[in-house]
Amino acid sequence: MKNVTTDSFETDVLKSDKPVLVDFWAAWCGPCRAVAPILEEIDGEQEKIDIVKGNVDEHPELAQRYQITSIPNMKVFQGGEVVKDIIGATPKAALAADLAQWL
C-alpha cells in the first residue's frame, strides 16, 4: 500500500480515476496496527479500489482538513469527494461489507 503525503494527496486520491480508501493512522495506535494487515489483504485481492495510508502524525494538515479526531479512520474518496466513512478497527468481513459496492 502506498503512503500518501500532503503533497501527493491531490494526485493520489482526489484526482484518481478509481475510488480510493484512505486509512488515516498513526504508529502509536494499536487498533491501527490491527487493521493494517486486513487492509493489505483486501488491497491484494482486488483492483477496483486503491487503498492508501495517511499518517496523521507526519501529515497533521490532512487530519485537520478531513476532521480526523479518532483513528483508525478510513474514508473512501470518489471523484474527489468523501463518499464513505469507516471509523474504528473492524474485522475483515465487516470491512469488506462496508466496501462491497467498490469491491
Where are these regions (language model features)?
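Conserved helix-turn-beta segment immediately C-terminal to the redox Cys motif
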Residues: 17-19, 34-54
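Adenine-nucleotide cofactor-binding loop residues
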Residues: 57
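Conserved Rossmann-like nucleotide-binding pocket used by diverse enzymes
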Residues: 5, 25, 52
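Structural micro-motif
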Residues: 60, 66-75
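Conserved redox-active cysteine motifs that mediate thiol-disulfide chemistry
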Residues: 24-38
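A short beta-strand-turn-helix
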Residues: 2-19, 60
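Short pre-active-site segment immediately N-terminal to redox-active cysteine/selenocysteine motifs
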Residues: 17-18, 24-28, 70
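Non-catalytic, surface beta->alpha helical segment in thiol-disulfide oxidoreductase systems
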Residues: 78-103
